[in-house]
Amino acid sequence: MHTHKAKRVEITIEKIMQSRLSDALVKADVHGFTILPVYGGSGRSGLWDRTGQVGRAEGMVQFICIVREERLDALLTAAFKVVEKHIGVVNITDCEVLRAERF
């Protein structure tokens, strides 16, 4: 089966920023993404999980986007405008897809 090269972008950000990041991606013509809950992890401040959090933050979410390489800069530019001043991580990896017309 023939595969096609693409980029997988994972953006982990505070849940409170979910709608702003969704809107920014759609405005940048990135319509295909999945949003998953993040239950915990470890970072510069040590281990954390979402239990016992107080306030509006409600933990973290992760966006997963798969795009053609020529769409990557538009996605990153839109995402960075939202992510740059907040807690978050952006990860980019090479991947392959079966149906290139979907991306």
Feature map (PLM): residue ranges:
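Positively charged, small/polar-rich N-terminal and surface patches that mediate targeting and assembly
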Residues: 1-103
